[in-house]
Amino acid sequence: MIRRIFLIALFCVMPCYKIVFAQQNLSGSDRPIEITAKESLEWHRNEKFFQANVDVRVVQGETTLLSEVLTAKYRESENNSMDIHTITATGAIVQIVMQESKAFGQKAVYEVDKAYAVMTGDNLKLISPDQQVTARDELQYWVDQGRLKAVGNAVAIRADDKIEADTLIADFKEDKNGKRVLKSLQAVGNVVITTPEEILTGNNAVYNADTNIAEINENVKITKDQNVLEGSKAEVDLNTNISKMYGGVTQEGGRVRGVFYPGSVEKPK
């Protein structure tokens, strides 16, 4: 759906410059967007874009974007209003704050028509109260779908648990209070799951938040101290703390393999 944008005001407020828009945009709401900059705001009418320079702050509801430079490209509609279609933020550190989460990078691009955002740069990071996600290449977010994708050496840490993979994909849903909560987490490629008790590896994994069960597939290995379980598929029930390993075509004879060393596991205190 094309988001309509109307220019409400463009004026100078020393020592900052301010511009206010009304559009469904950064946070998927109809609240107005306010852009302030320490140095200047430029309106390039021929090229059809706005540019804010130095210490830029974009605020819409509970969502805030901070950067050094921001450009907003727009198209003119038939009724002479302006539809912003692409927002680009750059700087040594670009920060997006939404509710209790913060994302960090060096460049962020938001495609308004697609409700799609991508963040790139060094030290990509997403921090929330109970977990942290890092990636080497990109952090992608689909606003309407509630999907987050971390690409390239992706790592998610929560308490004492860590999951690593080439790509991590998190899907969210709204709870009864209208707050987005985790629905599922997919790990794709070179998966390593580390807990205080064991290390699990495989080609891919899926965690279902509703059932609290994780499934690891292809070339699966569970290592606890010196003991090793190998199979084609593993299920880990985090409710009962019971893990099941299954054989398959990737295993010799389709059998599960386990190697155990007596006395290698410390007894619970």
For the regions a language model picked out, list residue spans one by one.
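Bacterial N-terminal signal peptides
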Residues: 8-16
